[in-house]
Every structure is written in structure tokens, then in C-alpha cells.
């Protein structure tokens, strides 16, 4: 094309009138003409593509308003696909050398219709030869008997789709056939419209109504741009079948059934279909981005380290005052005593809790008064998740998760998991892509070792989208599944496969339902706004549920019950209207490294025999409790970060024997950990809400397998007493640990720091509660309070810098032995009337009050303690009345004599002693040794939290 020629716009206008052969010839003139022909993409190539009667819009039926990237390329793909059925034409010719000189026979075109060469399809087929083209002109063609295709032919309808209707039952016995632009309806004598057992059939731009299509292996088929109205495609043992850009409407049963393992025998078309699939654009993401950091909640600093505690006295004064003396009414100390409540507990007046490493240094005193400083370091919370994320939550601020908690993309997950990548790239059995299934009963049913792959489809307004049973495998990539009247995807009887990158929402039952030993990989899906749960695992179902977004579902985001045993890792489960994860009815599961946030009920709810392993999760910003362990719930709760929930961090029943260890529980609205034992009536189900009714299948009663796997799980160690150990419990709105239980409880090696009420409150404990080797510091009121009629043993604890008393007790059997009670603003120990306490071998110090204060007729044995004098105006020991039941034996009282006096806690060093008792979270267990339906959860708001129920959350 010369520079002085016509403008390009004028050339495009001229070339727009050319037909396809002429465009091809023009593109061969030179490179300039070739590029000019390519530039006609949005004009002439678009007209040719949409004007072709053998195809429809390239993005029909799912996105008919979205233009393809290239109309020319789309037209090219249509043309090449229309020729697939003849690929073996040369193979059927004679292979002897003389065939090279034989004149090739031209394909004939046979016309069928009124006034044409043939009156019926049957008569035309009787005269057809290999690869002839039979054209049906507009009209209705009804065949009274079964048509048998004995030679490869092409049957095409003339005119617009719908003008040629064929009422027939066709049985293909030849190697290949193509049918195009036809409307099929079944003949009067058979519902089967088309059947093939060994050959290849290709349907393009056809409509099928109210009948069946059957393809048996080693037969194959390729179906494109077809509409199926109440029509069932049955694929039995097919090695490969391709359904593309099809619409399935109004099915009374399944739209597509894939049955049987793909046949090992393959016909000639298998390799061509496989090549066509591999050359087509993939639905797998291709972005090449760096891996994001994986969630790692176990990389924490050491919880604490042994320390030496120095008590440094500055100033001088005469020795101690008499033990029975009281402070002067006008003194500063007298005003501090006025802060003691009616029960003898000191109430802090300052609004903030101390987080500092040093104890109070007399900030309320005048500068000319003597100063007393405690130079030890108080153990604070363990840092987790790096930095400021776990600071005080800001009201109204948006939630910004650290980069290490951001979900990986599907491509990143597949690159990390080579087996999943190989599975995603595999093609076997039936490939269904870019199809629309709507307004019917079922979408795709895969059974009896069948194999099916679904990419880029839409399933809507069905009873269910996909069912996979009896050792079958499905691969589902980038599908939309919504408004199903039951579950979206249903797997049972050892079904499996890969479910990745799908958008599953607004379904009446679970988005994904896994039962009876099914074991799929569920990866990088969005499962949301379901009318019930997001994912349900029950009846010995398994599965790996990883890196999904599960949100805004009406019931639990993930429901595990009836021996369900999945591995749930790396998911974001948020904004659910019930619990984030619920484990009921003997459900198990390994639940690790998930972000569970902003759910209306408990982040994780464990009840009725549920026994999961809950490890290294972030459970935050919930509108109720972080973790709920209800009636008969068990399990290991280890290494989790439970943060900023409006209820308790952990609410549990001690009768269930939960094991709560190595968790970081902070900034929750109520208690850090609350332990109860009273039954809440949750074992009673209201009428009409039985489990069988909630999860029944097609109205049938469910008989679940009751065989349990051997309890040799290395993730759990057997315990016989409820255990709270090695946790960091800090900055919670009420007490760090609240106990109201009639069962025994062990509280061991925890850091309980800077909580808004007491460190530990024991309100009820008819069986012994053992509190050992804990660091209890900087809490807004007392370090430990024991109510009346409670049995508590306090041993080996460090109780430092609390704004009330160190320990205050009304209990009738309290043992305080070998503790360090140092630097608290109230008395070290406050023994209230009618209490019975043994105080043995403790080291006790208070800055502003008494070392030990005995109120009324308290019964006490105070023996072999070291009691340091605090403020100069206070005595070491105070006894309000002459109480003969208070026995003092072999105690050592230390008072300062001169400014340089220094006391050190060195033999033994400052408590708690944790070097031998600290447990770290055990290593993640990747194997699947965790085992399958829970009753419906119903919310009930209780009037008060102290009714011994989990706040906002109860199982009815």
C-alpha cells in the first residue's frame, strides 16, 4: 500500500463489503494489507461472527453483552471447531501408495424438504456417502422409526435456529457425525433423541427439548452453543466429552449425568478434543506475583523468663509500729483506706491500668515524703502478629489486618501445592465450561467413579448445582453457584476432587455439603450470604478447606458434626450471623491459622461431644465470645490469638474438660477466660429442630455411620481435669479469669495482666481450683479474689502491682503457699470474715497498705512467711479484732533500718518459676486424623452475663 493511496478509514469501509474468502486473499498481499485486515476486528469480523448460523455470540449464554477480546479470533475458533468431526477423513482412505494418484471424491450436498431432492431425512441418509452434507430446509421432520447412522455425515438446518425441527430417535453406528442448527424433540416411541456408543458426535447451535441424549464410552462428543430444555445428557464411561457455551433450562432431574470411570479405550477424536482443550484459554489465573507471607501465629516471643526481684528502700524511719495499731485519721494512708469497698476489696480510682515494667513509685505522695520503689520487671503480654495490630482497638476504626494475614490468590496457592496444580490442569471424563444451568432441579451429577471438570459456569435457581458421589472426582474452577434450593455442591460416599476459585452464595442450604468419607480440596472460594451454613462437614466427611473467604452466612461459616473431620486452615471467616465455626455432635477437625472475625455469635463454638484441635487462629472483633466450649464440648485450644471480642475471650464449661493452652487473650469486652459448670439447657432441642430434619437428604432419614476411629491422635494429650495453662490473658474488660464451677479446675503458668477488673475471680468452686505458677500483674482491682464457700489452692504465683489487694478471700478452704505477693496497692492479703485460709511460705509486700489484713473473725494459719514492710505509716500486719482463730507461727518481718537497705528475692528467685513448666504450641499436624451434623443454632440474648450462659449465645 503506497503512502499516497487512500486513507485507512476509506480502505476499511471498502473492505467491509468483502466476503470471507476475499478477506483471506487480501491478507496475503503484503504485511500492510494483513494488518489492515486485522484492523477490521470490531466491524467486518464482528459481522461475520454474529451472522454465522452455526454459532452464537462468543460469550453466550453467560455474558452476551461482553465483547470478546478479538472477534476474528472467536470466528476462527468457531470455524476450526466445526471441522473437528472430519479430522479422521484421511485415515479412512486407502493407505496404499496408489491412493496418492486417486482423484479425491468431492463431498455432496443432499437437500431435504418439500420440493427438494429428498422428502425425509431417512431417505437422504439411505443415499448418503462418507462425509456428505445433508441440508434440511425449514419445516418439521418426524421420523416414525429409529434412524441408524451408518456412515459419517453432516446434518445442517437451513435458515434461522428454530425453523427446522426434527422429531426422531437417532442411533449412531459410524465413527463421526455433526449436527447443526436443528431443534430436536423426541419421537413418539422413545425419549432418547440421540445415542452413540463408540463414535464421535458434534452438536453446534442446536436446541433439545424434553428428551435424553446418551453417549457411551469409548464414544465422545463435543457440544457447543446449544440449548437444553428439560433434557438430560447421560455420559457413561466417556473418555472425554466437551460441553461449551450451552444453556440448560428447566430440568426435571439432572441436566448432565457423568457415570463410570473414563474408558481406557479411546476413539480417534480423543486426541483432537484434548488438543482443542489445551489450546483454548484457561480459567486458571496466570498472574506472576510474589507469594504473600503465610499466616504464622506460632512465631511468638518467649512468654517470660526467670528474674531476680529487688526491693529497694529509700529513706529512713524507726522500726515497725505495733501490729494492732491503725493509721492516723488525717494521714494520706487513711484516705487510701477509704477506697476499700464494703467487702474489703480495694477499688482503684485511677482510670488506667499499669502496663509498665516498674511498680508504682508513690505517685500520689508529696515530693517531700519518702519514696519506695520496687525494681523488678512485671511480666506483660506476649507480642504476637508483629507490632501494633494487637494494641487497644479504636472505636469505629476500620479493621486493617497485617500483610501476613492477607489471603493468597488461587495462582499462589496452586504454585505452592503441586498436586493441586496438576489436578487443576488435568482433563478427564467430561469438561463443562462457560455453560448456564438454571431454573431446574439438578445441574451436574457425577457418580460411580465418574470424572468431570467444570470451568466458568453459572448454576442458578436449581435444587442443587453439583452432586458427586460413589468415589467420583470433580474439578470446579471459577463457577458461580447461587440461589439453589438445597446445597450448592454436595459430596458423599467418598467423593472428592478440587473446588477452587468459585463464587457460592445465596443458597438455601450449605454452600458445600461434605458427607460420608468424602474428601475434597476446597481452595480459594468465596462462600457467602447463605441462608444456612457456608460449609457443612458431617457423617465422617473429611476434606481440606483452605484459603477461602466465608462470610455473611446465616448460620455457622463452617459446621462440623457427626464425626466430620476436615482440615480447616488459612481461611477468612467473618461477618456471619451465627458462629464462625461450630463443632457439635462428635465433630472433630484440625482448625488452624484461620482469621475468624466479626461474627454475631462465638468465633468458634464447640458443644455436644465436639472435640476439635483449634490452633494458631486469630479470633477477633466478634460481637459475642471468642471461643465457646459448651455442654459436653471438648478439644484442644492452643496457640490462638483471641482479641477484641465484645463478650469473653473464652467461655467454657469445666465439665467438658477443655484444654486451653498457649493462647493470647486480650482486649475482650468481658472476661478473658470464663469457666462455668451449670447446665444451660442446651441439650434439649425444640420440637421441629431435630438434626435429622435439618440435614436430611431428599426427605429420607439419615443413618450415620457410628464407627469411630481409634483415639490415638497425637495432637491431643488426655486430660481428666479442665486445664487453662500457659496463656497470656491481658487487657480484658472484666476479670482475666472468672471461675464459677462445681468441677475441679487447674490454672497453670498463665500471664494474667492489666485486665479491667481482677486478675482471677473465683466466685464458685465446690471442687478444688488449683492456681499455680501464674504471673498476675497490673490488674485494675485485686490480683485474686476468692468468694465464700470456695476451695482454692494458690501455689507458686507471682502477684505483682495490682491496683487492689494482692489476694482477697472469703473462701472456707483457701491455701496460699509459696507465692510472691509484691507491690500491690492494697494489702498483700485481705482475709475477710468467716474465711478459712492457710498462708504458708509466701513473700509478701505492699507499698501503701498492710502485708496481711485480717478482717473480723477470719480463721487463718499464717506460717513461715517473709513479710516486707511497705509504706512507713503502715504496719506489716493488721488484725481488726482480737481473733484467737488467727494463728501466727515462724513468720519473718523485715523493716528497713537505713536508706541503703536492699532486699532481693533470690532464694528462690522471683516467682513464678516457669522454666520447666512452660509449654509451647505443638507443631502443626498436616495429616488428616481428625473425624463427621450439628443441631441448628439459635441465638438468645440473656438478660445478664452471670446467668452462667455464654453472652448472646446459646444452643437451643
UniProtKB/Swiss-Prot annotation:
Impact noted for substituting residue 762 to C: Found in a patient with lymphoma; partial loss of function in controlling the stability of BCL2; requires 2 nucleotide substitutions
GO MF terms, alphabetically ordered: ubiquitin-protein transferase activity
One GO-annotated biological process of the protein: ubiquitin-dependent protein catabolic process
Positions of region (Disordered): 314-367
UniProt keyword annotations, A-Z: Apoptosis, Cytoplasm, Phosphoprotein, Repeat, Ubl conjugation pathway
Short name of one Pfam family: Beta_helix
Membrane-spanning intervals of the chain: none
SUPFAM superfamilies: F-box domain, Pectin lyase-like
Outcome after substituting residue 44 to H: Found in a patient with lymphoma; inhibits interaction with SKP1
Cross-referenced PANTHER family: F-BOX ONLY PROTEIN, F-BOX ONLY PROTEIN 10
Subunit comment: Component of the SCF(FBXO10) complex consisting of CUL1, SKP1 and FBXO10. Interacts with BCL2. Interacts with PRDM1.
Protein name, UniProt field: F-box only protein 10
Gene name of this polypeptide: FBXO10
Amino acid at each position: 500500500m503506497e503512502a499516497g493511496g487512500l486513507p485507512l478509514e476509506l480502505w476499511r469501509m471498502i473492505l467491509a463489503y468483502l466476503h470471507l474468502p476475499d478477506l483471506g486473499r487480501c491478507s496475503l498481499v503484503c504485511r500492510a494489507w494483513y494488518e489492515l485486515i486485522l484492523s477490521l476486528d470490531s466491524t467486518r469480523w464482528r459481522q461475520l461472527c454474529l451472522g454465522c448460523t452455526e454459532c452464537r455470540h462468543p460469550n453466550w449464554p453467560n455474558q452476551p453483552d461482553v465483547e470478546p477480546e478479538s472477534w476474528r479470533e472467536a470466528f476462527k475458533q468457531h470455524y476450526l471447531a466445526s471441522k473437528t468431526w472430519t479430522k479422521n477423513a484421511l485415515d479412512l482412505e486407502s493407505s496404499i501408495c496408489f491412493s496418492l494418484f486417486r482423484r479425491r471424491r468431492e463431498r455432496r450436498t443432499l437437500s431435504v424438504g418439500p420440493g427438494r431432492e429428498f422428502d425425509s431425512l431417512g431417505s437422504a441418509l439411505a443415499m448418503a456417502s462418507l462425509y456428505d452434507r445433508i441440508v434440511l430446509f425449514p419445516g418439521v421432520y418426524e421420523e416414525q422409526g429409529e434412524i441408524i447412522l451408518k456412515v459419517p455425515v453432516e446434518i445442517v438446518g437451513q435458515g434461522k435456529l428454530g425453523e427446522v425441527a426434527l422429531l426422531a430417535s437417532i442411533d449412531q453406528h459410524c465413527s463421526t457425525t455433526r449436527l447443526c442448527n436443528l431443534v430436536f424433540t423426541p419421537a413418539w416411541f422413545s425419549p432418547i433423541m440421540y445415542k452413540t456408543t463408540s463414535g464421535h458426535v458434534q452438536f453446534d447451535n442446536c436446541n433439545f427439548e424434553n428428551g435424553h441424549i446418551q453417549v457411551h464410552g469409548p464414544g465422545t462428543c463435543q457440544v457447543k452453543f446449544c440449548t437444553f430444555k428439560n433434557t438430560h445428557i447421560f455420559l457413561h464411561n466417556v473418555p472425554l466429552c466437551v460441553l461449551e457455551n450451552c444453556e440448560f433450562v428447566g430440568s426435571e432431574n439432572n441436566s448432565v449425568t457423568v457415570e463410570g470411570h473414563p474408558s481406557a479405550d479411546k476413539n480417534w477424536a480423543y486426541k483432537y478434543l484434548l488438543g482443542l482443550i489445551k489450546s483454548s484459554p484457561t480459567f486458571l489465573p496466570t498472574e506472576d506475583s510474589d507469594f504473600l507471607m503465610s499466616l504464622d501465629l506460632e512465631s511468638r516471643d518467649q512468654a517470660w523468663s526467670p528474674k531476680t526481684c529487688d526491693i529497694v528502700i529509700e529513706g529512713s524511719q524507726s522500726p515497725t509500729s505495733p501490729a494492732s495499731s491503725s493509721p492516723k485519721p488525717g494521714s494520706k494512708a487513711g484516705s487510701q483506706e477509704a477506697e476499700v469497698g464494703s467487702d474489703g476489696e480495694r477499688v482503684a480510682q485511677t482510670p488506667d491500668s499499669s502496663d509498665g515494667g516498674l511498680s508504682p513509685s508513690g505517685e500520689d505522695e508529696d515530693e517531700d515524703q519518702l519514696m519506695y520503689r520496687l525494681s523488678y520487671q512485671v511480666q506483660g503480654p506476649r507480642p504476637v502478629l508483629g507490632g501494633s495490630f494487637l494494641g487497644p482497638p479504636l472505636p469505629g476504626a476500620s479493621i486493617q489486618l497485617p500483610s501476613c494475614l492477607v489471603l493468597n490468590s488461587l495462582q499462589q496457592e496452586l504454585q505452592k501445592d503441586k498436586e493441586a496444580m496438576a489436578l487443576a490442569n488435568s482433563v478427564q471424563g467430561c469438561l463443562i465450561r462457560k455453560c448456564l444451568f438454571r431454573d431446574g432441579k439438578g445441574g451436574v451429577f457425577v457418580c460411580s467413579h465418574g470424572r468431570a471438570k467444570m470451568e466458568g459456569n453459572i448454576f442458578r435457581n436449581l435444587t442443587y448445582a453439583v452432586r458427586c458421589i460413589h468415589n467420583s472426582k470433580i474439578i470446579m474452577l471459577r463457577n458461580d453457584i447461587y440461589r439453589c434450593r438445597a446445597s450448592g455442591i454436595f459430596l458423599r460416599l467418598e467423593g472428592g476432587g478440587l473446588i477452587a476459585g468459585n463464587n457460592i452464595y445465596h443458597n438455601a442450604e450449605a454452600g458445600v455439603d461434605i458427607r460420608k468419607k468424602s474428601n475434597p480440596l476446597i481452595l480459594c472460594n468465596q462462600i457467602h450470604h447463605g441462608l444456612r451454613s457456608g460449609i457443612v462437614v458431617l457423617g465422617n466427611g473429611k476434606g481440606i478447606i483452605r484459603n477461602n473467604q466465608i462470610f455473611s452466612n446465616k448460620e455457622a461459616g463452617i459446621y462440623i458434626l457427626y464425626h466430620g473431620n476436615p482440615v480447616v486452615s488459612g481461611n477468612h471467616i467473618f461477618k456471619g450471623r451465627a458462629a464462625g465455626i461450630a463443632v457439635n455432635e462428635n465433630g472433630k477437625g484440625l482448625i488452624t491459622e484461620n482469621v475468624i472475625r466479626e461474627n454475631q455469635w462465638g468465633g468458634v463454638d464447640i458443644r455436644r461431644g465436639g472435640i476439635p484441635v483449634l490452633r494458631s487462629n486469630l479470633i477477633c472483633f466478634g460481637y459475642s465470645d471468642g471461643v465457646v466450649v459448651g455442654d459436653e464440648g471438648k478439644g484442644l485450644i492452643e496457640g490462638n490469638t483471641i482479641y477484641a471480642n465484645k463478650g469473653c475471650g473464652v467461655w467454657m464449661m469445666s465439665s467438658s474438660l477443655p484444654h486451653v493452652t498457649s493462647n493470647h487473650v486480650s482486649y475482650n469486652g468481658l472476661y478473658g477466660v470464663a469457666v462455668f459448670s451449670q447446665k444451660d439447657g442446651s441439650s434439649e432441642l425444640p420440637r421441629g429442630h431435630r438434626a435429622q430434619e435439618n440435614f436430611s437428604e431428599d426427605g429420607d432419614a439419615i443413618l450415620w455411620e457410628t464407627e469411630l476411629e481409634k483415639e490415638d491422635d497425637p495432637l491431643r494429650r488426655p486430660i481428666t481435669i479442665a486445664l487453662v495453662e500457659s496463656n497470656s490473658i491481658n487487657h480484658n474488660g472484666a476479670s482475666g479469669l472468672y471461675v464459677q464451677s462445681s468441677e475441679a479446675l487447674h490454672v497453670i503458668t498463665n500471664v494474667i495482666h492489666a485486665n479491667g477488673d481482677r486478675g482471677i475471680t473465683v466466685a464458685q468452686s465446690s471442687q478444688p481450683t488449683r492456681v499455680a505458677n501464674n504471673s498476675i500483674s497490673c490488674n485494675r482491682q485485686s490480683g485474686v479474689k476468692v468468694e465464700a464457700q470456695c476451695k482454692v489452692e494458690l501455689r507458686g504465683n507471682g502477684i505483682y502491682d495490682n491496683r487492689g489487694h494482692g489476694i482477697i478471700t472469703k473462701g472456707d478452704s483457701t491455701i496460699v503457699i509459696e507465692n510472691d505477693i509484691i507491690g500491690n496497692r492494697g494489702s498483700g492479703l485481705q482475709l475477710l470474715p468467716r474465711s478459712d485460709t492457710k498462708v504458708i511460705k509466701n513473700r509478701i509486700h505492699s507499698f501503701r497498705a498492710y502485708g496481711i489484713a485480717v478482717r473480723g473473725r477470719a480463721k487463718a494459719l499464717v506460717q513461715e512467711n517473709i513479710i516486707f514492710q511497705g509504706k512507713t505509716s503502715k504496719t506489716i500486719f493488721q488484725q481488726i479484732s482480737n481473733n484467737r482463730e488467727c494463728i501466727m507461727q515462724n513468720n519473718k518481718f523485715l523493716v528497713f533500718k537505713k536508706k541503703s537497705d536492699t532486699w532481693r528475692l533470690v532464694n528462690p528467685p522471683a516467682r513464678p518459676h516457669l522454666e520447666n513448666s512452660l509449654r509451647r504450641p505443638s507443631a502443626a499436624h498436616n495429616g488428616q486424623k481428625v473425624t463427621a451434623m450439628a443441631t441448628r443454632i439459635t441465638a438468645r440474648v440473656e438478660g445478664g452475663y452471670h446467668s452462667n450462659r455464654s453472652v448472646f449465645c446459646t444452643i437451643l
